[in-house]
Regions:
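An N-terminal hydrophobic leader/cap segment in hydrolases
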Residues: 3-44, 52-54
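Soluble extramembrane regions of membrane proteins in the secretory/endomembrane system
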Residues: 30-294
């Protein structure tokens, strides 16, 4: 009787087994074989909005052994799961990570602003403020960063500007020590870059299909060696006598201590493949090792 029932429902049981095994192995990978705790959290912001995020906390991090903190911001119409690979790679190297659902995406609330990236960083600004106030005892508040792809990259640029202006007004260090901008260069403009007090890494796909919006046109639209956007980002950090007319890809310009370190990458990829490519991911990991060091 039991054998007949098992035989009759074999396909169902097989599928359920695959689901459970896949979930188990996915959990093992997400937690870096149990070395990282992953928790779904929610932040109620002062303006009545709700930001939902996954917190990746290395188990070795505590109030005595504080670690850097990086906010990961997905792009337009993407929920937090779209960049879970970046959160996993950074957390397994000892960083605490907040992988957010941007405002109006995933489980986060809608935004009260029509300019959610510019004025709120899709929720990243509020989270940086919250963490900088010392609400996570295991975080080194002098090593807070952000990374994002596409519109999430724009949020990172806007964060450097927003917290840079705040630092200038209060004559303090920027709360946002370092940012990494992936797949977005449209807002690398002088009026936005001039107040940045954050180190900045930039990664842009050479074959990005959105490059037609950039300042250069034709085949050179995405060439970050000569693009006005990348040249501005680098020259903004250099004295006038040392400014350049061609960017050396992968070279670090400026000073980490002065919070004007700059580096530009130009991987031979299409826009949507950038966050999942081995070379582009390695460039981002190496950047955060450079600015923060691995705990």
């Amino acid at each position: 009787m039991i054998y007949e029932k098992l035989k009759k429902n074999f396909s169902l049981l097989f599928c359920l087994g695959i689901i459970f095994l896949s979930s188990f192995f996915a959990s093992i990978i997400q937690t870096s074989f149990g070395s990282v705790d992953v928790e779904l959290k929610e932040l109620k912001t002062d303006d009545g909005q709700t930001l939902v995020y996954d917190l990746y906390k290395p188990k070795l991090a505590n109030s005595s052994d504080k670690v850097p903190f990086v906010v990961v911001v997905p792009g337009f119409q993407r929920s937090k799961e779209a960049l879970s690979n970046i959160a996993i790679e950074l957390s397994r190297r000892g960083f605490a990570i907040a992988l957010i659902d941007p405002y109006a995406q995933g489980m986060s609330s809608s935004s009260t602003s029509r300019l959610a990236a510019t004025t709120q960083g899709y929720g990243m600004f509020a989270l940086v403020d919250y963490v900088h106030e010392g609400n996570f005892a295991f975080v080194d508040i002098n090593k807070i960063g952000s990374t994002g792809h596409s519109m999430g990259g724009n949020a990172a640029i806007r964060g450097a500007d927003y917290f840079g202006k705040e630092a200038i007004r209060s004559s303090t260090k920027s709360k946002l020590d370092s940012v990494f901008v992936s797949g977005y260069v449209l807002t690398l403009r002088d009026n936005i870059l001039k107040d940045s007090k954050s180190n900045m890494g930039i990664s842009y796909a050479l074959y990005d299909e959105g490059a037609f919006r950039n300042e250069l046109k034709g085949w050179d639209a995405a060439n970050m060696e000569i693009a006005p956007e990348s040249l501005r980002a680098v020259n903004n950090a250099l004295p006038k006598e040392n400014q350049i007319d061609r960017v050396e890809l992968g070279k670090y310009y400026g000073s980490k201590e002065e919070k004007n370190l700059r580096v530009v990458f130009n991987e031979k990829l299409l826009h949507p493949f950038q966050p999942y490519n081995k070379e582009a991911t390695a460039n981002q990991i190496n950047y955060f090792e450079k600015v923060f060091g691995f705990p």
